């Protein structure tokens, strides 16, 4: 039985050092619980709605330095977290350093690389560009990266093999919108499901809107029941401002079984830490 801890931390937008302090505490708490793995939300180190901070090189270098700190803290536990990845050798459309909305994993004090991966992180595939979301303004998607590398998305989107004690879990790591694929021409979940994965892990920075959680339960329940793969969903909480509107993030971390049934859900806007027991055959 694999113990997977989650933490829906109260992310402070733009304050990497304070977010690191929270993350460091959660790593220690997960150790004390005997967890094999800790899963944290999307953009938990930097915040999500931080506007043109994404264009400040000093901020990006600080982000890189603290990603290294998280990796170093994984000496006896696997850690999966959402953060910004930077490729200083490439640029985006505005000639600024290329950035990815990414998921990192580390174990034994070192970064892990997805199966057949070209980077030591997972790149978000579907970048939202509506309401409060500005992903396409700042980040490069896996779709664009694959196109430039001459790869199909099926080749570029690969499982993450994550150590968990004496076992290894073959996971499909998703970043928020990657599971909200109803209005897209492709489904990252469907692609990963064909690659013999045992568990989906969705790292999210999903603001609260009325009825959104109910829609997520319906949407994921339908998708997972068809793919026959369970999921753990981890969302951040707190308050963030995109310069136009303030948005609350309610957490509501959840687990779904392979039938798509919601089997556990954290309380909204609170600090509950969940410990899920996962068995690949159940």
Report the location of each language-model feature:
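Enzyme catalytic cores with a strong preference for nitrogen-chemistry domains
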Residues: 1-282
